[in-house]
């Protein structure tokens, strides 16, 4: 790797937003590299069946979709590097990205590091993803039509998931460790009126019951300590997400949950730096919205680079 080489665009994160940026940038003739810690796709690659991404009438698994996105971007000249980002200096005109494989310099940076769902931390939880354990009701809810599902959580995301699932599943059981929801009151009132939703207050999920897939959960009462088992077909964990932004330090504006503050134009508080996908502040976190962000970031980056070049030219009086 040549540390004196200056890329037009460095993309940190190889999810759908990152590789869409790579595709658009490479097709525009920009010297582009994607730096990904593990494998292409991010959280998407862990999804065993995606039915809500246009163009695949029979659905597609996340790993295959990620592979297609990566190959398409690389076909037009984008490069991929597998490395962990340790530090970034984004303040100058040239941005510096320090990784486990060396230092990369770029004129612009797209941050596409995503957000990971918070897990319960139970034995076999990871292994049962796609086999009864899920973290996204809008992604996986349709697989539980006329089934019994448990939703863990008490905030707005849990309530939203429960409301959506109540229109699909036979029964929805909300398990919350307190005796009241933290969600907005209007959502709370709506759920209370929904016939196929029931609540297990002051309870936590302490164990997953399974064979080849999830068959139930063991609950523990936080007041009495009593335990009991609920039979269910699915468990939706809705206890929040953690954006991957710790490596940024204090140099870029984050909201109180750690998400990068960026609007629909993907611009951050630092000129020439853009945030796409689940890592930025947004209302809807889906593959299609991440893809849209990726295209927008390249559009804004091109405008930024054109303006930077124009401002660097000497003024020649008439």
Features from the language model and the residues they span:
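A Rossmann-like FAD-binding core segment of flavoenzymes
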Residues: 5, 73-92, 96-98, 104, ...
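Glycine-rich, N-terminal phosphate-binding loop of Rossmann-like dinucleotide-binding domains
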Residues: 14, 113-114, 239-240
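Residue-level detector of alpha-helix initiation sites
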Residues: 15-16, 39, 115-117, 155-157, ...
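Glycine/small-residue-rich loop that forms an oxyanion/phosphate-binding "nest" at active or ligand-binding sites
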Residues: 80-142
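FAD-site-proximal beta/loop scaffold in flavoenzymes
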Residues: 121, 127-143, 239-289, 293-296, ...
């Amino acid at each position: 790797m040549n540390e004196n080489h200056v890329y037009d665009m460095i993309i940190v994160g190889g999810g759908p937003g990152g590789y869409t940026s790579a595709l658009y940038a490479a097709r525009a003739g920009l010297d582009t590299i994607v730096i990904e810690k593990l494998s292409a796709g991010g959280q998407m690659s862990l999804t065993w069946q995606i039915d809500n991404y246009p163009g695949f009438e029979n659905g597609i698994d996340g790993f295959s979709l990620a592979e297609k996105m990566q190959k398409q971007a690389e076909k037009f000249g984008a490069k991929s590097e597998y490395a962990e980002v340790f530090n970034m200096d984004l303040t100058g005109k040239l941005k510096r990205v320090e990784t486990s494989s060396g230092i990369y310099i770029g004129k612009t940076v797209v941050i596409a590091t995503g957000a990971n769902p918070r897990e319960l931390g139970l034995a076999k939880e990871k292994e049962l993803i796609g086999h009864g354990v899920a973290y996204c009701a809008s992604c996986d809810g349709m697989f539980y039509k006329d089934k019994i599902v448990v939703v863990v959580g008490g905030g707005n995301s849990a309530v939203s998931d429960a409301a959506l699932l109540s229109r699909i599943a036979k029964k929805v059981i909300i398990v919350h460790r307190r005796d009241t929801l933290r969600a907005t009151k209007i959502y709370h009132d709506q759920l209370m009126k929904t016939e196929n939703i029931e609540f297990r207050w002051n309870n936590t999920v302490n164990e997953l019951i399974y064979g080849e897939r999830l068959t139930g959960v063991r609950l523990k009462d936080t007041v009495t300590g009593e335990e009991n088992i609920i039979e269910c077909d699915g468990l939706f964990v809705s206890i929040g997400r953690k954006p991957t932004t710790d490596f940024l330090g204090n140099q870029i504006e984050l909201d109180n949950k750690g998400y990068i503050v960026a609007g629909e134009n993907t611009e951050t508080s630092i000129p020439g730096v853009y945030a796409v996908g689940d890592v930025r502040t947004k209302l809807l976190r889906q593959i299609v919205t991440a893809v849209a962000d990726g295209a927008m970031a390249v559009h804004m980056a091109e405008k930024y680079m054109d303006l930077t070049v124009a401002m660097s030219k000497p003024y020649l009086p008439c």
